[in-house]
From Swiss-Prot:
Name of the gene: coaE
EC identifiers of the protein: 2.7.1.24
CDD domains reported in the protein's UniProt record: DPCK
Family: Belongs to the CoaE family.
Superkingdom in the source lineage: Bacteria
Annotated source species: Chlorobium chlorochromatii (strain CaD3)
Full protein name: Dephospho-CoA kinase
Length: 212
């Protein structure tokens, strides 16, 4: 019997929007989850070509070894460079995103063989990197700027000023919303977000079942 691809769903949103929480909820409801940003971070310390490329871009001092002897990357230093240097940001993305795309294709193949109904792809820069191509549904999670800053600071992602600088170089919420199939407002409680995600899951499951 021929394996059928699952419904491919992209979830994105700016820093502090709550996209990761939506993805965790979807995973708890039975969706398979591909975390593009996690895969990208793994490539940065495991893929020899990526390591060579990052070293060429930012210098060998961005890498070090932890007490366990494992290679680690100083992402904070890199973030400070790329958020003020679009050329290096573009070079970094061109280095990593094609390899993430290969990993996602492998995840799609595995999901099809396992008869998975819905595969969710979480990515911070889904549209910006072109990673939305081929997806069936794209969900954008949004929240008020002040709330996003507060969440990011609470997570220890930087000071208020650092977070605001990062938000300033991300795509505007209006631009993301215009490209989305579904927009989820996350200005409320985690419980409210769960209910919205549950409704989304039920809609996605209906779409997935129609394909099988």
């Amino acid at each position: 019997m021929e394996s059928k691809l699952p419904l491919l769903v992209g979830v994105t949103g700016g820093l502090g929007s709550g996209k990761s929480m939506v993805c965790r909820y979807l995973a708890s409801m039975g969706c398979a989850l591909f975390e593009a940003d996690v895969v990208a971070k793994e490539l940065q310390v495991r893929d020899s070509k990526v390591i060579e490329g990052i070293t060429a871009l930012f210098g060998k001092e961005v890498y070090s070894y932890n007490p366990k002897g494992e290679l680690q990357l100083n992402r904070k230093d890199i973030a400070q460079v790329v958020f003020s240097n679009q050329e290096k940001l573009g070079a970094l993305n061109r280095l990593i995103h094609p390899r993430v795309a290969v990993a996602f294709q492998q995840a799609c193949d595995n999901a099809a063989r396992s008869n998975v109904a819905i595969l969710v792809k979480e990515a911070a820069i889904l549209f910006e990197s072109g990673a939305h191509a081929g997806l069936d549904v794209v969900v954008v999670v949004q929240a008020a700027t002040e709330l996003r800053v507060e969440r990011a600071v609470q997570k220890g992602l930087g000071t208020r000023e650092e977070i605001l600088r990062r938000l300033a170089v991300q795509w505007a919420p209006e631009k993301l919303a215009a490209l989305a199939d579904v927009v989820i407002d996350n200005n409320g409680t985690p419980e409210a977000l769960y209910e919205k995600t549950k409704q989304l899951y039920e809609q996605l499951l209906q779409q997935a079942m129609l394909r099988r």
